[in-house]
Amino acid sequence: MFGSVWEWAGKIRHSELSIGVKAYLVLMELKKLSDDIAYWKANKTFSTIETATRIHHRAVVIHSFQNGNGRWSRMLANIYMRQNRLMPVKWQDDLLSKENVKRDAYIEALKKADTGEYEDLIAMHGVTYWL
């Protein structure tokens, strides 16, 4: 999509960042996420919204790309929701890209999810285009 603008666009990262898993683990972690998604769905481990939330969070944690990981993670969760007959989350990406109260709440919800507390992030996934 942006390959003509940024050479790294859409390519799995091979360099270390201050966030995300080690670069050599990215592909393994994506495979584990894919396997977990299949397991969660087959075993009805979580509701669709909670599964989408966990997909979003894990994709952020993995941090597969040099840039755009938040947008990609939110899109991935929305694709899962659409595949499961739910409307996508209304993220307001323009507000998440700059410092403000909504971005702060979003970052805080991701940090809580890092500790296993998904409630705030699940609540954010409940704000869909149906509303």
Per-region residue spans from a language model:
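FIC/Doc superfamily catalytic core
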Residues: M1-L131
